[in-house]
Amino acid sequence: MGEYTISKALNNNVIICTYNNQEVILIGKGIGFNKKAGMTLDESASIEKVYKLEQKQQQEYYKSLVEIADEDVLQAIIESVNFITSTTHTTDDKNLVVALTDHIIFAYKRLKQNQIISNPFAIETKHLYSDAYAIASQVIDKLNQRLDVKFPPDEIGFIALHIASNTEDLTIHEMSLINKLISKSILIIENDLNHEIDNHTVQYQRFIRHIQFLIRRLNKKEYIYAQDVFIDMVKNHYPNAYNTAFKISKMIQKHLNIPIDDSEIVYLALHIYHFENQISSSHN
């Protein structure tokens, strides 16, 4: 049976150890109580999590977070990570634990100082990552109860992005960019149609999904192609929708620095035409 040699106890629940000549982080309730450097733990100790953070910078940052964190907050974070991984059936959560520790520690600090940050992309996140959003909602409920606080609803969207990044083939940066481009696309449509888009409709959900997969295709250099006759038909029959789609394509192109083909623009135009129809129907 292997042994962990303690390098440092960060607090009662987190210790830094060496195991097989590698530095690891052990997490467990009370695992660091009265522990000192040089002591050993065997694998039968009450260890909840073992993290081997490959990047030295990531290791040092996590240590610095744990050292400034209130122990109740840290335990609530550990419970949140355990809940997320068991609910999503994921095992590789070392990036999630660092990201959530970072986010929740500072969100809690802001809350105590009455500094509330709004989430401009909460609606997009809820629609695009509905499963992660539902789990995040439960996480916030548990944190509120555990820490006797009331996090604002916008925090659900922030936590959802961290959960989704651990279960989907996307980074937080990529998801945030997708949300930003969707929001800008909707603004372009609303300006051109002079009408607010209802974000509760099936059409809205289909459109933002289309934008999401468009951006993912472009980043992976995967392209779709439409026949010239179809492209001409859309341009001629739905000129306003095509014009709006063209504006959106130019905006996305500017952000991604990737050219967008006419085939992609006409499929965008069809979605926009459905919005036009929806608005016309509501006026009749």
From Swiss-Prot:
What Gene Ontology molecular-function terms does this entry list? RNA binding
In this protein, which residues make up the domain named PRD? 65-173, 174-282
Which family does the entry's similarity section mention? Belongs to the transcriptional antiterminator BglG family. GlcT subfamily.
Q: Which InterPro entries match?
A: BglG_antiterminators (IPR050661), CAT_RNA-bd_dom (IPR004341), CAT_RNA-bd_dom_sf (IPR036650), PRD (IPR011608), PRD_sf (IPR036634), Transcrpt_antitermin_CS (IPR001550)
Task: Cite the entry's keywords alphabetically.
Answer: Repeat
Question: Which Pfam families does its entry note?
Answer: CAT_RBD (PF03123), PRD (PF00874)
The yes or no answer to whether the keyword Repeat is present is: yes
Family matches, as SMART domains: CAT_RBD (SM01061)
Which domain of life does the protein's organism represent? Answer: Bacteria
Q: A single GO BP annotation from the record?
A: positive regulation of DNA-templated transcription
Instruction: Please give the name of this protein.
Output: Protein GlcT
